């Protein structure tokens, strides 16, 4: 199926998927400014989007803790989805962020979320090939 561009496809229907949590319609809209893919988040020291997503994804193992039991940290995948969508729409077309969004969609929506996330990654590669992050070497 040939790429249709961001204006011709509904954000939550990439690759034929349908999810209960709506994706933002502007995920494939170019970022305002000189580069349509925005900034490289790997070198960002202000927004720290990668760090925020990593923290939201972090969870403790299910290992016995003996006498020093503490509350186990669980991943917050709805927060991962929100941060990733905000970043992709307004800051950077970043494949690592798109992959984390896909993981979040899989965890919150199941296989239909995975299908939508993979479709988003494919669309980012198609629509932003020359400028998507990380840049090809």
Language-model features, listed with the residues they occupy:
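N-terminal domain-start signal
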Residues: 1-136
């Amino acid at each position: 199926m040939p790429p249709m561009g961001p204006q011709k496809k509904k954000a939550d229907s990439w690759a034929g998927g349908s999810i209960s949590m709506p994706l933002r319609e502007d995920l494939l809209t170019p970022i305002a400014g000189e580069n349509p893919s925005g900034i490289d988040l790997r070198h960002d020291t202000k927004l720290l989007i990668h760090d925020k997503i990593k923290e939201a994804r972090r969870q403790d193992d299910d290992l016995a803790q003996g006498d020093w039991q503490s509350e186990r940290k669980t991943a917050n995948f709805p927060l991962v989805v929100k941060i990733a969508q905000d970043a992709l729409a307004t800051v950077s077309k970043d494949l690592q962020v798109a992959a984390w969004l896909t993981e979040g969609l899989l965890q919150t929506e199941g296989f239909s979320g995975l299908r939508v996330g993979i479709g988003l990654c494919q669309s980012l590669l198609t629509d932003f090939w020359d400028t998507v992050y990380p840049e090809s070497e």
